[in-house]
Amino acid sequence: MSLINTKIKPFKNQAFKNGEFIEITEKDTEGRWSVFFFYPADFTFVCPTELGDVADHYEELQKLGVDVYAVSTDTHFTHKAWHSSSETIAKIKYAMIGDPTGALTRNFDNMREDEGLADRATFVVDPQGIIQAIEVTAEGIGRDASDLLRKIKAAQYVASHPGEVCPAKWKEGEATLAPSLDLVGKI
């Protein structure tokens, strides 16, 4: 079943953010764009490169009104230990949610049950809590925060411009499309 255009389910998890442990629920996402950035595990190999890339783009994400939630099935304590020991992870200013029971990961239908780990997946959620974009890659394939930014800008544009769609590789300021009978077969 596709989760596109479905509402995120209620959740309550502990997280590590800016040197503190905090509780995060679905209510924290209301009224704001959110990215749930699932990754398999702390202290691994591809994961820190991705999380560091998102950290490098975090200021721009914040300017777009986007909150980022990194999620793995590690505990919030493990997130703190990783944050304290890795120069790359120490750059992170967004919330790192611990999901040791896997409940949040299962809410997004993103659990590798045989391993108890999250798949490498990104979910873009609109201010109403509706999933607008999903990207899932194999464990050995890292994601690109630049493309995540592009997708968020496209999702925000489409949300504020009903009747328009963003074509492949669309970037902010470029032409969009207005689907109509006249356009059929002309692209």
Curated annotation (Swiss-Prot):
PROSITE patterns in UniProt: THIOREDOXIN_2
Keywords assigned: Acetylation, Antioxidant, Cytoplasm, Disulfide bond, Oxidoreductase, Peroxidase, Redox-active center
Knockout mutant characteristics: Increased sensitivity to hydroxyurea, probably because more reactive oxygen species accumulate.
Domain Thioredoxin, first and last residues per copy: 2-157
EC id: 1.11.1.26
Active site, renumbered: 47
Induction profile: Repressed by sulfate or cysteine.
Gene Ontology CC, one term: cytosol
Residue numbers carrying N6-acetyllysine: 17, 93, 153, 169, 171
Coiled-coil region: none
Enzyme class: oxidoreductase
Pfam families with a match to the protein in the record: 1-cysPrx_C, AhpC-TSA
Location of the protein in the cell: Cytoplasm
Note: The active site is a conserved redox-active cysteine residue, the peroxidatic cysteine (C(P)), which makes the nucleophilic attack on the peroxide substrate. The peroxide oxidizes the C(P)-SH to cysteine sulfenic acid (C(P)-SOH), which then reacts with another cysteine residue, the resolving cysteine (C(R)), to form a disulfide bridge. The disulfide is subsequently reduced by an appropriate electron donor to complete the catalytic cycle. In this typical 2-Cys peroxiredoxin, C(R) is provided by the other dimeric subunit to form an intersubunit disulfide.
PANTHER family cross-referenced by the UniProt entry: ALKYL HYDROPEROXIDE REDUCTASE C, THIOREDOXIN PEROXIDASE
Name this polypeptide is given: Alkyl hydroperoxide reductase C
Organism: Escherichia coli (strain K12)
GN (gene name): ahpC
